[in-house]
Amino acid sequence: GFEFDQRYSRFYQVILTGSGGLWNLMRLYANRHLSELNRNNPVVSGDTIRYLPLYQADQQSYFDKKMREKLGLPVDGLDFISPDAMDPSFFSLEMFDINDLYAAGNPAVVYQGYTPWGKRQRRVAPEKFFEDRENRPQNAFAPTYIALYAQDKFEFDKMFFNLGVRVDRFDANLPVLKDPYIVRPFYRAEETARLLGITLPQGVGGDWVAYVDNALNPTRIIGYRQGNTWYDANGAPTSALSIIRASGGRPRPHLKADSLTFEAFEDYKPQINIMPRISFSFPISDEATFFAHYDVLTQRPRAGQVAQFVDYLFIVQNATLDIPNPRLRPEKTIDFEVGFKQLLTSNIALSISGYYREMRDMVQLFSFFGGYPVSYTSFENLDFSTVKGLNVDIDIRRIGVLQLRFAYTLQYAQGTGSSVTSSRALIGSIEGFNVFRSLLPLSFDQRHTFTGTADIRFLERGVKGPAITIGEKVIYPLMGAGINITYNLGSGRPYTRYLLPNPADVQFGVNPVNLISGQPFSARLPWYNRFDIRVDRDFIIQRGENKQSILNVYVIFLNAFNQRNVLGVYPYTGLPDDSGYIQSPVGQQLAQNQYSKETFEYLYRLKERNPGNFGAPLRIRLGLLFSF
């Protein structure tokens, strides 16, 4: 088979409020050129001397000019205009030029596949962003995905095989930085050595990056870098901190220009993945079967890939934000399972299997510490995780009215990160720290899971239930009726305990650095259990001689016994409804400073009772299904 997929992702957003919103920008841009007084031309009126505003043409914004033109006022006039006093319908995006909208690194518009003024834009050459500075076009995200696959199922000597292979080609169709540490056009080490008339140390590659004493006019080399590994001037491994200290506070690569140009970018290298899929089974005996499968799967990066040139253009101003990384590769999963099925009796089957799943190239935050012109945080294919476990299933086929099924899973899930932002706290608190690489329990590491299902049903072809005779007619009132009971039991998932209560757990805008109690993800939530019950009955509706419809009436009880299951806790106390902050000395001091200590504590405790920390209570659903 063959598959081709190209999707176009466009978006346009105008930010109206806040410090970078359009309304605030209008206040800043209006009359900006009239902020000084013209002290060389005083206006004398009797005993009063007045100074008129000084018109500074080079300080006048494009927005101010367009606003005065639209009002019919002289562009170089001295009238003071208040945008807040005007009808909002008076304004339009066309009254702003690109520099006004970009606001020196705090853009009021975010766009992709549109013009900065909200009109749909055709695809252009990516370098147009740097060439057309009045429009700054940014293309829609248009990745291409091509796949070839083949699969065959056959039998050989009582062995059943299902073999397949899939070849994927993923192209993000995005320009990527030639080196993510350098947001500028730069020279490679061999070029730097040639320009300085020196020879590279033994072991230093010509395609490495040389760090020098002066970025544009170097006289000596201070160190080198290959990928994420740093070296001193002699080619010996060192750290980014050492290069920074030797460079006087900031590492300086040898640059072709100290401004961002298209020369700093290259095309995304398409990723080709070969994914074999193998499964087979064969009988061990007349009552037992062995089975196994091996799969390799890939998926496109989950997050952090769609970067725009504007992200790099203002990287100094936005270095505290997470900058997307367009060079991300697809994430890969390798899955292996082996097991056997055994028929214990004519009605009972046992299945036991063990599985191993490995996730590679998972996306995680990464700090490009020592980057130029500034260190920043982005994303890299760095995370990996393993999930291994054992499944045991017992299936009891229907005997009379009863059918049973029991399933148990023992699982161990470990990895370097549970989400793309798992490393944020460590990256932000340790200077020079790039990424967390230790194996820890993942957030979905649930050690034990048990599911039991019982289905009691009166069928027309089986046990019809009690009979009622009315005259010569025999009625089975329970025929077509049934009850299904599902029981779920599971051990708690891991979380990280803190040594101090955190007001950010309840309040907004407060997030102090906290200390971990023990190891990350070493604490566990409580076990949970819940019953779900479904009661239903089929009613046969005859439509003609040979046609009939079925009306199924059902009622479902979710969490039938209203179990109080804990899904989340506050990391200091380990409780779902008490963060521990209000009882702490800091919390008590905060409460004492309120107008009413009792009211503050009461409202704070109300907010602590986060319903998201608990499973849903008893819910009852009534429904109809009509089949014809």
Enumerate the language-model features and the residues they cover.
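Signature of Gram-negative outer-membrane beta-barrel scaffolds
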Residues: G1-P283
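Transmembrane beta-barrel strands of outer-membrane/channel proteins
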Residues: F2-Q6, L163-R169, A292-V296, Q305, ...
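Residues that define the transmembrane beta-barrel architecture of outer-membrane proteins
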Residues: A142-I146, P270-I274, K332-F336, T386-K388, ...
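Residues on the lipid-exposed face of transmembrane beta-strands in outer-membrane beta-barrel proteins
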Residues: L148-F154, V165, I278-F282, V338-Q342, ...
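Outer-membrane beta-barrel channels and translocator barrels
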Residues: F156-M159, P283-E287, T333, T345, ...
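Membrane-embedded beta-barrel scaffold of Gram-negative outer-membrane proteins
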Residues: P283, T289-P301, Q305-Q308, L313, ...
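Gram-negative outer-membrane beta-barrel transporters
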Residues: S351-R493
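C-terminal beta-signal and adjacent terminal beta-strands/loops
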Residues: R461-K464, T469-P512, P526-R530, R537-F628
